[in-house]
């Protein structure tokens, strides 16, 4: 299961996106939210910090927490640079998320994968590529590797639904952080085939490592997005 503050942050985010909370009004105070979600004020504070990091809300000292006015102007394809919920949770409020498995095998890691996942050369890994679609429209092409020993029993059914749901709800692992590098690339043959782009169309690549709460790398991935399907939102709250 995901940490409670993450679950609460997701619910508040959903309410913001569906405009249950008006952009010109403060969010309910932390005490009211703690009562509603049957939790502590500290957990609500953690949820608020997560939403601040994602760029959804900001605080005014002595006045409360407010929704950023420009948040709803973002493209449906935009995602937070700090988001590590997985594609299904990130975009499910916009419609139906589906995945097509392009490739799935078990093999040993190369040197880059060993370094990124902090594993030995003889540690088996899952290697899979998935086309992620939102309401039937190609969204991203994700190439992912995961250590077999951390995610035992992973199969095609999980890949077609939600790997992160399997990891968190079935295996009970807690995902707590990510490291990402974003760059523009020329499309590969797979990109052109599955993302329906031209040889001259750039793709946005997010190279990432997702970590468990104890700092263990869970996933090393390269996610490719069409250039015209939004971008990565980076928020500086300093």
Task: State the predicted function of each range.
Residues 43:
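Residues in the helix-turn-helix
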Residues 30:
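Helix-turn-helix DNA-binding elements, focusing on the entry/boundary residues of the two helices
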Residues 96-238:
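C-terminal all-alpha effector/ligand-binding and dimerization domain
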Residues 4-8, 18, 22, 26, ...:
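HTH-adjacent hinge/linker in prokaryotic transcriptional regulators
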